[in-house]
C-alpha cells in the first residue's frame, strides 16, 4: 500500500448498559486519483443485542469527532470490544475500498497506522479480531498468563507481523458452528450451535449488508473535511451538549405535553432552559435576586399552559372582536406570528389598529362563525353585506382561512345560567372604576356575556363571566351605600328607581343567584412572572408583583422606573408564569441592568439636541441618530401606536416625557382614585350625522395640588409655534405678544379662571376662537367644562374629537397660553 491514509471515526456511547459504540470511518487514499467511498463502521460489544444501521450517512444524528486511531478505548470497564465493520463496497473494478486499504497476509490484515486487525469470512465482510493496547511488560506478561489459564484464544496483536499466521485461532472443540454465523470462536462464552441467539441479529445484519451496496448516494460520495482534534471529555461532558441538542430537536418535533397548573416540575424545568439573551436566564436571575417566581398553580390554564401549538400562519384570515368596540366583529388577517401570540390586522383599515392576542384567545373565531351564531360581521370598505361570502372573499384576496382546529373550542363550555340578552344589572365602569352604572346583557357567547351600559357607546362594553368582580345584581349600590349612575339623559337622575326603570323598559333583572363569587388570588408581593408591555404590546418583559388587591395585581417591570407600573386583573391573558416565553418560543426581554440604565443609549449615542445640525450636501438626511436614545429601548413600537418602530425620542413609548401622549387604557389598570382624563373620550369612527357615539366621561373636581404636580415637560410645543426654537429652558411668556394677536379671546384670561368655566362658556370660547359653531358644538356634546378643557392635549382634540388640524392648533395653543399665565398650572 502506498500513499497516505486519513481516517475519521465517529464515536458515540449510547448507553452504559450495552456499551454500544458507533464508529464512522472514512478512508481516503491521497495518492490515488480515483474517488474514495465512505466506510461506516459500527463497533458493537459482545453483549450488544441488536444493530440498526442508517440507510445513509445523514441518518446518523451524532457529531463527528476525529480520533487518532492508535490504542482504541475500551468501554464498559475492562470488557473487550469486538467490532463488526461493514465496508461500503463497490462493484466497480477500479474503485478503492476499505478492504483494499488493508495489508492482507493470509486471512487477516492490520489496519495501517493502528493496532486493529481484521479478517474476512464468507458471512461478514470484515471482522476485527484484536485491538492493541499499550501496556507495560509486566501487564503484558500477566495478561498472557491469565488468558492461557482461562483457555481464551485471543490473539496478541502487539506481536510482529511475521507471526500473523500463528495469531489465527485454531479450530478445535471450543469452536462452535452456528447455523446462522458459521464457524465462530466461542471465546469462552456459552454459544449454542442452534443459532437461536444470533439468527435474528444475523438476519437484520444480512439485510443491511445486502442493502449497503445500493446506498451509494451522492451524499455518501461527498468528500468530508477533516476535523480538528478535540481534547478528551468525560462521558458526562460529552453527553450534556448532545442531550441538549437532541432535546431541542425533540421539543421542536413533538407536540407539547399537556400540563396542569399544579405541575411545578414544568415550571422548574422551564427556568433551566429559559430564554437566554446576553447571558440572562431565569435560574441565574432568581439566584442573584434571591427571589421566587409565582407558582404555576396561581395562573389560569389559558395563562400558563399551551395545550396546542400555534398553527396560525401569516396571511390567514379569521373573524374577531375589536378590542376598542367589543360588540363588533371584523375580518382579521394574521399579520405576525411570535411564539404563541398573534398580531391581527383589520382588513381594509390602517395597521395602526393592529392588536396582539394569544393563539388561544376566546375573542377570535374561524371564518363563517358569525353566520352560524347570528352575529353581524363588519366588512372591509367596498363590500356590501348582502353580497358578501367568505368563499368569494378568499378567492378575491387569494388568501386562506385559518383552519377551525386552530381555535380554542368553547362549545363544551356551559352557558352562563341566569344571564340572558336584555337583562339588567349594575356594573363597574372599567374605564372609570369609581363609577357603578346601569347596564344590560347584550350578547352571550359560550361561557361569557357582554356588558353594555345603557344609552352609552359600545367603547365601554366588556366581556365577562358570572364570577367577575365588576358586576353586581340590581340594588347592590343601595345596599352598599354607593351612588348608582343612571343611564344617559335619564329624565330625573337623582330620583332613579330600579322598579320604575324595569317597568319602563319592559325588562327584568338578572337574578341574584346567577352571580358567582370569585375567590381572591394568591399572588404575593415580589413574586416574579412574565408580562406583556402595555406600551409596546409586541414585547414581553420580566415583571414583579409590586402590590396586590383581591382580584388585581400591580406589576413592575424589573430594572425600569416605577412610572411604568400598572394594575392588571389576576386572570388577564397578558400575564404568564416564568418560563412561558421559553416554552412557547416567544422572545423575553430581560430586566434592564444598571449599566444599561446609566448609559446614554444602547448604541452609546449622545442625547438628541434640541436643534439638529443642518444636513450636508452629500447626504439628504442625517442618519447619525438612528437609534432611540432612551436607555433600554430597542427602537420597537411607537408612542402613537401607528408604527412598529421609532428612532427618535419623540416617538419612544418608554420615554418619560411621552407618558402624557400615550393612550390611557384604564380598564384593569388604574385605581379608583385616578382622575378622569378627557383622553378617554370615545373615538368617532362613525359619521357625525349618525349622532354621538360613546358617552362623555364623568369628571370630579381635581385638587389644585394634583394640577401643580403636572411637570412642564409634559406640555409639548405644537406645530403652531414651530417657527421658534423649542428650547426647554425658554419660558413661553416670551412668545405671548406674538401669538396673542393670532388667538382672539385669549388675552387677559388665566387658567384659574378657565378652570371654573361651565360647558356653555367653553362652547362660547371655542366658537369665538375658531369661528365655527360646528367645531364648538363638539365640545358641548362631550360635556367638556373648563377643568376638562385645560386637560386636553393636541392628540385628544385631533384624533378623538375629530377636530380639523387648523382649529385644533388654535385651541391647543390657547390652552397653553392659559396655563402659562398662571403659576399654579405651569
From Swiss-Prot:
**Location within or outside the cell:** Nucleus
Citing just one GO molecular function, the answer is: histone H4K20me2 reader activity
UniProt-listed SUPFAM superfamilies: CCHHC domain, SAM/Pointed domain, Tudor/PWWP/MBT
What are the protein's UniProt keywords? Chromatin regulator, Metal-binding, Nucleus, Phosphoprotein, Repeat, Repressor, Transcription, Transcription regulation, Ubl conjugation, Zinc, Zinc-finger
The SAM domain covers which part of the protein?
A: 757-821
Sequence ranges of Basic and acidic residues compositional bias: 242-256
- Tell me the InterPro entries matching this sequence: Mbt (IPR004092), MBT_L3MBTL1_rpt1 (IPR047361), MBT_L3MBTL1_rpt3 (IPR047362), PcG_chromatin_remod_factors (IPR050548), SAM (IPR001660), SAM/pointed_sf (IPR013761), Znf_C2H2C (IPR002515), Znf_C2H2C_sf (IPR036060)
Q: What is its main location?
A: nucleus
KO phenotype (gene knockout): No visible phenotype. Mice develop and reproduc normally. Mice were followed for more than 2 years, without any alteration in normal lifespan or survival with or without sublethal irradiation.
Task: Give residue numbers for the site Positioned at the entrance of MBT 2 and is required for recognition of monomethylated and dimethylated peptides.
Answer: 432
Which residues does Zn(2+) bind? 628, 633, 646, 652
A single Gene Ontology biological process assigned to it is: hemopoiesis
Zinc finger motifs (CCHHC-type), residue ranges: 619-662
- Chain intervals for the UniProt region annotation (Interaction with monomethylated and dimethylated peptides): 453-460
Q: Where are the MBT repeats?
A: 280-380, 388-487, 496-591
Region annotation (Disordered) maps to: 167-197, 220-271, 586-621, 663-699
Q: Per the record, what is one GO cellular component?
A: chromatin
Q: How is it modified after translation?
A: Ubiquitinated in a VCP/p97-dependent way following DNA damage, leading to its removal from DNA damage sites, promoting accessibility of H4K20me2 mark for DNA repair protein TP53BP1, which is then recruited to DNA damage sites.
**Reported tissue expression:** Highly expressed in brain, testis, eyes, and ES cells.
Tell me which residues are marked as the site Mediates recognition of monomethylated and dimethylated peptides: 429
Q: Give the compositionally biased regions (Basic residues).
A: 612-621, 683-699
Please give the function described in this protein's UniProt entry. Polycomb group (PcG) protein that specifically recognizes and binds mono- and dimethyllysine residues on target proteins, thereby acting as a 'reader' of a network of post-translational modifications. PcG proteins maintain the transcriptionally repressive state of genes: acts as a chromatin compaction factor by recognizing and binding mono- and dimethylated histone H1b/H1-4 at 'Lys-26' (H1bK26me1 and H1bK26me2) and histone H4 at 'Lys-20' (H4K20me1 and H4K20me2), leading to condense chromatin and repress transcription.
- What domain comment accompanies this record? The MBT repeat 2 specifically recognizes and binds monomethylated and dimethylated proteins. In contrast, it does not bind trimethylated proteins. The MBT repeat 1 does not bind methylated peptides but inserts a proline ring in a Pro-Ser-Ser/Thr sequence context.
User: Oligomeric state and partners?
Assistant: Homodimer. Interacts with RB1/RB (when monomethylated at 'Lys-860'). Interacts with p53/TP53 (when monomethylated at 'Lys-382'). Interacts with CBX3, ETV6, KMT5A and VCP/p97.
Name under which the protein is recorded: Lethal(3)malignant brain tumor-like protein 1
Q: Which organism is it from?
A: Mus musculus
Instruction: Provide the taxonomic classification.
Output: Eukaryota, Metazoa, Chordata, Craniata, Vertebrata
Amino acid at each position: 500500500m502506498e500513499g497516505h491514509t486519513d481516517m475519521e471515526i465517529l464515536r458515540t456511547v449510547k448507553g452504559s448498559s450495552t456499551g454500544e459504540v458507533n464508529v464512522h470511518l472514512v478512508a481516503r487514499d491521497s495518492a490515488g486519483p480515483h474517488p474514495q467511498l465512505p466506510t461506516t463502521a459500527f463497533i458493537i460489544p459482545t453483549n450488544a443485542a441488536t444493530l440498526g444501521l442508517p440507510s445513509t450517512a445523514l441518518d446518523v444524528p451524532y457529531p463527528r469527532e476525529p480520533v487518532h486511531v492508535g490504542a482504541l478505548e475500551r468501554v464498559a470497564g475492562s470488557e473487550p470490544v469486538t467490532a463488526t465493520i461493514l465496508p461500503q463496497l463497490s462493484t466497480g473494478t477500479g474503485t478503492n475500498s476499505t478492504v483494499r486499504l488493508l495489508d492482507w497476509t493470509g486471512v487477516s490484515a492490520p489496519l495501517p497506522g493502528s493496532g486493529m486487525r481484521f479478517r474476512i469470512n464468507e458471512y461478514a465482510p470484515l471482522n476485527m479480531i484484536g485491538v492493541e493496547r499499550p501496556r507495560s511488560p509486566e501487564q503484558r506478561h500477566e495478561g498472557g498468563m491469565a488468558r492461557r489459564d482461562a483457555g481464551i484464544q485471543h490473539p496478541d496483536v502487539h506481536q510482529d507481523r511475521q507471526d500473523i499466521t500463528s495469531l489465527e485461532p485454531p479450530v478445535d472443540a471450543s469452536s462452535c458452528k452456528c447455523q446462522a454465523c458459521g464457524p465462530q470462536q466461542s471465546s469462552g462464552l456459552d454459544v449454542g450451535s442452534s443459532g437461536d441467539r444470533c439468527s435474528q441479529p444475523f438476519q437484520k445484519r444480512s439485510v443491511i449488508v445486502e442493502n449497503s451496496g445500493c446506498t451509494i448516494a451522492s451524499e455518501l460520495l461527498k468528500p468530508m473535511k477533516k476535523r480538528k482534534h478535540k481534547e478528551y471529555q468525560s462521558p458526562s461532558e460529552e453527553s450534556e451538549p448532545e442531550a441538549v441538542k437532541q432535546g431541542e430537536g425533540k421539543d421542536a418535533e413533538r407536540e407539547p405535553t399537556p400540563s396542569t397548573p399544579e405541575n411545578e416540575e414544568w415550571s422548574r424545568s422551564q427556568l433551566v432552559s429559559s430564554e437566554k439573551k446576553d447571558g440572562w436566564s431565569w435560574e441565574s436571575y432568581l439566584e442573584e435576586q434571591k427571589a421566587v417566581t409565582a407558582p404555576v398553580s396561581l395562573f389560569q390554564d389559558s395563562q400558563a399552559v399551551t395545550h396546542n401549538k400555534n398553527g396560525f400562519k401569516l396571511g390567514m384570515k379569521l373573524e374577531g372582536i375589536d378590542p376598542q368596540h367589543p360588540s363588533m366583529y371584523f375580518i382579521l388577517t394574521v399579520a405576525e406570528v411570535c411564539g404563541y401570540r398573534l398580531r391581527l390586522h383589520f382588513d381594509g383599515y390602517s395597521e395602526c389598529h393592529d392588536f396582539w392576542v394569544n393563539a388561544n384567545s376566546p375573542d377570535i373565531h374561524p371564518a363563517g362563525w358569525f353566520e352560524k351564531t347570528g352575529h353581524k360581521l363588519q366588512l372591509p370598505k367596498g363590500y356590501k353585506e348582502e353580497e358578501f361570502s367568505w368563499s368569494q372573499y378568499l378567492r378575491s384576496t387569494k388568501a386562506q382561512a385559518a383552519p377551525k382546529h386552530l381555535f380554542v373550542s368553547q362549545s363544551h363550555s356551559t352557558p352562563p345560567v341566569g344571564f340572558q340578552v336584555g337583562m339588567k344589572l349594575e356594573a363597574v365602569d372599567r374605564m372609570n372604576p369609581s363609577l357603578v352604572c346601569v347596564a344590560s346583557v347584550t350578547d352571550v357567547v359560550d361561557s361569557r356575556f357582554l356588558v353594555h351600559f345603557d344609552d352609552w357607546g359600545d367603547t365601554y362594553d366588556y366581556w365577562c363571566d358570572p364570577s367577575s368582580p365588576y358586576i353586581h345584581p340590581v340594588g347592590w349600590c343601595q345596599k352598599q351605600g354607593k351612588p348608582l349612575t343612571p343611564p344617559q339623559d335619564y329624565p330625573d337622575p337623582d330620583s332613579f328607581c330600579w322598579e320604575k326603570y324595569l317597568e319602563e323598559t319592559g325588562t327584568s333583572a338578572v337574578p341574584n343567584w346567577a352571580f358567582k363569587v370569585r375567590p381572591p388570588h394568591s399572588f404575593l408581593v415580589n413574586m416574579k412572572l412574565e408580562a406583556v408591555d402595555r406600551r409596546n404590546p409586541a414585547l414581553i418583559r420580566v415583571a414583579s408583583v409590586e402590590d396586590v388587591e383581591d382580584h388585581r395585581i400591580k406589576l413592575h417591570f424589573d430594572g425600569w422606573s416605577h412610572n411604568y407600573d400598572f394594575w392588571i386583573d389576576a386572570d388577564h391573558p397578558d400575564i404568564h408564569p416564568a418560563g412561558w416565553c421559553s416554552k412557547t418560543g416567544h422572545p423575553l426581554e430581560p430586566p434592564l441592568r444598571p449599566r444599561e440604565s446609566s448609559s446614554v443609549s444602547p448604541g452609546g449615542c449622545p442625547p438628541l439636541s434640541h436643534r439638529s445640525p443642518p444636513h450636508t450636501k452629500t447626504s439628504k438626511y442625517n442618519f447619525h441618530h438612528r437609534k432611540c436614545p432612551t436607555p433600554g429601548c430597542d427602537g420597537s413600537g411607537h408612542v402613537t401606536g401607528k408604527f412598529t418602530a421609532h428612532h427618535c425620542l419623540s416617538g419612544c413609548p418608554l420615554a418619560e416625557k411621552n407618558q402624557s401622549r400615550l393612550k390611557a387604557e384604564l380598564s384593569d389598570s388604574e385605581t379608583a382614585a385616578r382622575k378622569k382624563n378627557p383622553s378617554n373620550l370615545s373615538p368617532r369612527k362613525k359619521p357625525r350625522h349618525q349622532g354621538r357615539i360613546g358617552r362623555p366621561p364623568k369628571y370630579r373636581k381635581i385638587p389644585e395640588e394634583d394640577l401643580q404636580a403636572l411637570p412642564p415637560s409634559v406640555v409639548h410645543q405644537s406645530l403652531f409655534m414651530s417657527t421658534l426654537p423649542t428650547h426647554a429652558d425658554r419660558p413661553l411668556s416670551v412668545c405671548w405678544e406674538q401669538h396673542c394677536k393670532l388667538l382672539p379671546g385669549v388675552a387677559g384670561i388665566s387658567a384659574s379662571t378657565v378652570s371654573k368655566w361651565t360647558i356653555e362658556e367653553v362652547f362660547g370660547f371655542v366658537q369665538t376662537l375658531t369661528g365655527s359653531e360646528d367645531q364648538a358644538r363638539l365640545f358641548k356634546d362631550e360635556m367638556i367644562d373648563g377643568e376638562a378643557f385645560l386637560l386636553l392635549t393636541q392628540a385628544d382634540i385631533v384624533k378623538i374629537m375629530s377636530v380639523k388640524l387648523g382649529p385644533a392648533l388654535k385651541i391647543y395653543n390657547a390652552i397653553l397660553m392659559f396655563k402659562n399665565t398662571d403659576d399654579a398650572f405651569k
